């Protein structure tokens, strides 16, 4: 019998090994996704969960940011809107969209989840608006948003050219320690409230105006509507006209 050459025996052995490996692979179950793939982060949120956002906008999600900020519109005329304690972006979104359609550059924001340092929430929204192209900014808000605006206005620099307070008043725990705190802000202030506001004592807005050393406009209407209720109440036309005139004058 003829003997096989060593080279032929090596070739046969290699072929056998390859056959075994292929067969083993075919019988093995499909490998599970890698641990890294399983931990892939979900896509970052690009808009708030409420409303339909049209036109130019930019959304800063939370997390990773301490509080969410929505920027609407463009240009140098900036407005920061702070909602009530029970609201945020979604609460003021209709107003923000209306202002953006009128040519204003608007920032709306949520309050941080830890319910602390609300002034920092408005400051972050203001900084985001300035970074997005605003040059002159009016801080505005309703109830908590109003008192926080009154409290932080003097600390945010010369870009802040006015404050609109709708049902704002002093609250040491939320960012406006005392009525006298506004004395350090020299810019114009619009103060809107009802005579029988259910949150702050009668005369609060007038006392804030008296403590303010800059120009101020005081609008006090009959009734007990508070914050956003005033924009839809029986004196809404007077209030909205005062807000429009203030924005036109300062921006």
What are these regions (language model features)?
Residues 35-72:
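N-terminal cap/lid segment of alpha/beta-hydrolase-fold proteins
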Residues 74-76, 83-87:
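Active-site glycine-rich loops that stabilize anionic/oxyanionic intermediates
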Residues 85-95, 111:
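The serine-hydrolase catalytic nucleophile loop
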Residues 96-115:
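Conserved alpha/beta-hydrolase
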Residues 114-132:
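Alpha/beta-hydrolase active-site loop
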Residues 141-149:
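Gly/Ala-rich beta-loop-alpha elbow adjacent to hydrolase catalytic centers
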Residues 178, 201-210:
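Short alpha-helix in the alpha/beta-hydrolase fold that links the catalytic acid
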Residues 185, 191-193:
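Short beta-strand/loop motif that positions the catalytic acidic residue
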């Amino acid at each position: 019998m003829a003997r096989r050459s060593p080279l032929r025996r090596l070739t046969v052995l290699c072929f056998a090994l390859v056959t075994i490996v292929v067969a083993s692979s075919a019988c093995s179950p499909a490998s599970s996704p890698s641990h890294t793939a399983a931990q892939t982060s979900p896509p970052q949120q690009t808009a708030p969960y409420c409303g339909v956002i049209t036109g130019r906008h930019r959304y800063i999600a939370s997390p990773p940011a301490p509080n969410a900020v929505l920027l609407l519109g463009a240009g140098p005329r900036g407005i920061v809107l702070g909602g009530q304690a029970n609201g945020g972006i979604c609460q003021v979104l209709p107003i923000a969209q209306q202002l953006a359609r009128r040519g204003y550059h608007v920032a709306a924001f949520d309050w941080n989840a830890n319910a602390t340092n609300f002034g920092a929430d408005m400051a972050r929204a203001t900084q985001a608006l300035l970074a997005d192209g605003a040059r002159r900014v009016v801080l505005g808000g309703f109830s908590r948003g109003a008192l926080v605006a009154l409290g932080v206005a003097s600390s945010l620099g010369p870009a802040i050219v006015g404050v609109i307070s709708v049902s704002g008043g002093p609250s040491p725990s939320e960012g406006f320690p005392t009525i006298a705190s506004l004395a350090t802000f020299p810019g114009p202030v619009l103060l809107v409230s009802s005579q029988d506001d259910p949150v702050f004592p009668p005369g609060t807005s007038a006392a804030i105006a008296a403590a303010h050393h800059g120009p101020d406009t005081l609008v006090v209407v009959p009734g007990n509507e508070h914050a956003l209720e005033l924009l839809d109440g029986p004196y809404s036309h007077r209030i909205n006209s005062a807000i429009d005139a203030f924005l036109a004058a300062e921006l």
